[in-house]
């Protein structure tokens, strides 16, 4: 499957959308509702794991570009709620380093969007995620291990912006850089929330330019929008109440599931 912006819905679906601009397939909502809740929970800092499953799960019912477009308004509301919840916990110095590289990644994603092969992108992100987890398991870092070099952080953050633009799967690359920093759960969550607020906000004009923000996708997004506060509330409660050890274990589990699902999508 190729990520052509024009290949979002079939001609029959387009004619149906004119009379009723909303997805009505029950199967779509059966996969979209848990996907949106997972995405909300990701605003607690689990974005590298469970949140990155949202588009692959929704892609069981619609195309990857359409799933990404439907989630845009939902993501904006979630990002605003996450910013409000963690407004006192941002590391502004760290974000000043991350955000410019992330924006470079979104520009690259926008320029290459029409010619990218979705399966190749999914497979590469999946392989990278699983290799990162294997490295953490086989060669666990010592407590006094230095943080990753900034040049590696720049590469991973550009990759995060790129994969976030293509399929809202920017969590694994960014987390591969941020996790070794050993931030507290709340600080980790605040960093992810602020970074992806800026990245997701920057996608709106390119998505409109690519023709992804049509009325059918936006109307469907409005139906899913009430789930956003529920997911974010669940995620914030988790980030503020669980221990750092359990937090990172859950994060790794989410990344494992994401890596396996993306790898599966890449080769099937």
Regions found by a protein language model. Give the residues of each.
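Interfacial loop-to-transmembrane junctions
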Residues: 233-256
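Short, strongly hydrophobic alpha-helical membrane anchors
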Residues: 3-27, 268
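A helix-boundary/kink motif common to multi-pass secondary transporters
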Residues: 63, 117, 121, 184, ...
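Hydrophobic alpha-helical transmembrane segments in multi-pass integral membrane proteins
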Residues: 67, 108, 112-113, 118, ...
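Small-residue-rich segments of transmembrane alpha-helices in multi-pass membrane proteins
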Residues: 56-65, 101-108, 132, 152-165, ...
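Small-residue-rich hydrophobic segments that form or flank transmembrane alpha-helices
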Residues: 29-97, 156-161, 171-232, 236
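Cytoplasmic-side transmembrane-helix entry/capping segments in multi-pass membrane proteins
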Residues: 92-102, 124-126, 147-157, 187-194, ...
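Transmembrane helix exit motif
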Residues: 79-89, 118, 124-149, 236-237, ...
């Amino acid at each position: 499957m190729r990520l052509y912006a024009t290949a979002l819905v079939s001609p029959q679906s387009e004619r149906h959308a004119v009379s009723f601009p909303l997805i009505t397939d029950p199967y779509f909502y059966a996969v979209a509702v848990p996907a949106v809740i997972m995405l909300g929970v990701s605003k607690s800092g689990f974005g590298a794991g469970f949140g990155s499953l949202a588009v692959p799960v929704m892609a069981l019912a619609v195309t990857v570009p359409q799933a990404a477009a439907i989630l845009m308004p939902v993501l904006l509301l979630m990002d605003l709620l996450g910013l409000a919840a963690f407004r006192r916990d941002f590391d502004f110095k760290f974000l000043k380093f991350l955000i410019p590289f992330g924006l470079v990644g979104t520009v690259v994603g926008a320029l290459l969007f029409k010619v990218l092969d979705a399966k190749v992108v999914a497979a590469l992100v999946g392989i990278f995620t699983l290799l990162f987890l294997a490295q953490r398991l086989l060669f666990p870092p010592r407590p006094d291990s230095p943080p990753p070099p900034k040049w590696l952080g720049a590469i991973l953050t550009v990759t995060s912006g790129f994969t976030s633009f293509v399929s809202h799967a920017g969590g694994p690359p960014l987390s591969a850089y941020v996790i070794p920093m050993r931030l507290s759960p709340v600080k980790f969550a605040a960093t992810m929330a602020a970074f992806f607020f800026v990245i997701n906000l920057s996608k709106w004009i390119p998505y409109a330019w690519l023709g992804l923000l049509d009325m059918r996708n936006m109307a469907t997004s409005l139906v899913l929008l009430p789930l956003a506060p529920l997911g974010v509330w669940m995620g914030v409660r988790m980030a503020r109440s669980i221990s750092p050890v359990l937090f990172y274990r859950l994060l790794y589990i989410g990344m494992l599931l994401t890596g396996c699902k993306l790898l599966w999508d890449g080769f099937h």
